[in-house]
Amino acid sequence: MALHLGVITLLPEIIQGIHYGVTGRAIEQGLVKIDCWNPRDWSSRPYKQVDDKPYGGGPGMVMMYEPLHAAIKHARSEMKENCKTIYLSPQGKVVRQNDLKQIAIQKQSLLFVAGRYEGIDERIINHHIDEEWSLGDFVLSGGELAAMVFIDAIIRLIPGSLGHLGSAEQDSFMNGLLDCPHYTRPATINGLDVPDVLLGGNHKEIERWRRKQSLGKTWLKRPDLLEKIQLSETDKQLLAEFKCEHGDSC
């Protein structure tokens, strides 16, 4: 059964970009189904208007309750019963890799609501939204790009969506750490060499090197992540070696 993901958006053309690359192949293979619904199709106002001035005054416009509610109701009727409705907002929780992994495993249908203007009527959020998600502490012009980011991140976790089974497993954050460095041909260019261990063919040593680099990169770039995972004694030794090799106390 395909994972069903939907988007409520005033600009469905933007979402069409998801039909290319890895995500596009997953759609063609029947691993995932993507649908869009435009609130303008449920507007009773002249010129399909979906926004109005905010009560209390202030700049900008607010997306109206009626067309949004009708679009959400219609979309949910076409999706699975376990569908969750997600409003994309900088006020939402920052979603982590493990959250998305669970969605891919459970094939949890999601309906993303992409806001525009100054936002959407709060009554939609309070009564028709299950969760609010954010990409981080910054503001976009609309929720469409955020929806595409989450859709892409979820799809690559679906078995069969990537060319190699290990590709997603090696991604940063999959095991709580950042990914190790990657190299390809040529072995030497502009005086820059690929590490010898990767050229030697000893798979045990290669895996040890990759684990050390993964631990080390996490320590250098995201030390906060190391505080959230339980390191084995081998991991502690590898991290100590990395620190020593990079000028830290040995």
From Swiss-Prot:
InterPro entries: Alpha/beta_knot_MTases, tRNA_m1G_MeTrfase_C_sf, tRNA_m1G_MeTrfase_TrmD, tRNA_m1G_MTases_N, tRNA_MeTrfase_TRMD/TRM10. Pfam families: tRNA_m1G_MT (PF01746). Signal peptide: none annotated. S-adenosyl-L-methionine binds at G115, L135, G136, D137, F138, V139, L140. One of its GO terms (cellular component) is cytosol. It catalyses: guanosine(37) in tRNA + S-adenosyl-L-methionine = N(1)-methylguanosine(37) in tRNA + S-adenosyl-L-homocysteine + H(+). GO terms for molecular function: tRNA (guanine(37)-N1)-methyltransferase activity. The keyword Flavoprotein does not apply. GO terms for biological process: tRNA N1-guanine methylation. It is an enzyme of class 2 (transferase). Its main location: cytoplasm. HAMAP family: TrmD. Homodimer. NCBIfam families: PRK00026.1, trmD. This is tRNA (guanine-N(1)-)-methyltransferase. The gene is trmD.
